[in-house]
Amino acid sequence: MNNLSMYVPHIWKSELDSEATAFLSKYFPDAIKTPMCVPIEKIATEIMHLKVVEHHLSEDLSILGQMCFTDGMAEIYDPVNDEYREIFVKAGTMIIDPDTYAKRNLGSKRNTMAHESYHWFRHRRYHLMAAQLDNETRPVYRCPTVPKSESIQTEWTDEDWMEWQANNVAPRILMPIETVGAVYKKMATESMKNAFVAKGLRPQSEWIVEQTAGFYMVSKQAAEIRLKELGYLS
């Protein structure tokens, strides 16, 4: 273990919901009291005072977003000239690839914003200490689309662990454990008012997932995973 590893939060899988609750308790406690679409962009820009900008980050959307922890140069991709170049960024700048929304969906963009906001909330100290130890600026932490396999955790770096944390906490921020149950019950009740569901022409679970995703403004895949991990769907 290197000296920096002591600054990586040690979070068990069973503590991920508590992490999301801690984040929301600090920045937007109403979201754990009342079922709502968590206003993650407002949280990031107006409450955390992060600067959110859009730039392409890769040719193939392999990087969805990146968080800038110190002033310095950040690499972006210029699709017009098909080249990578650097731009100056200030600490607290969140860069989102516009294709996160254009080629995916709004839920993906919101999840990326929650992901990067969590990095700032929980991992900023690590990156600031790393900058001091290296005696250089470390402005950017780039977040890959495809996470590292959990089957090789023994080989993970500090960055891999922090990425795992952000990957798992972000959807929990957008769908807090404190409100998902109430939303599920509401959607389950309303589903029987849908003619196709009532007549057995459409699976009730499919309708519930779709409506829950719309309520929280997340992807249907994210909503289904969340409802299953909390035991509301089998």
Q: Model-found features: residue ranges?
A:
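Active-site hotspot residues in diverse enzymes, especially metal/ion-binding acidic/histidine motifs
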Residues: 1-234
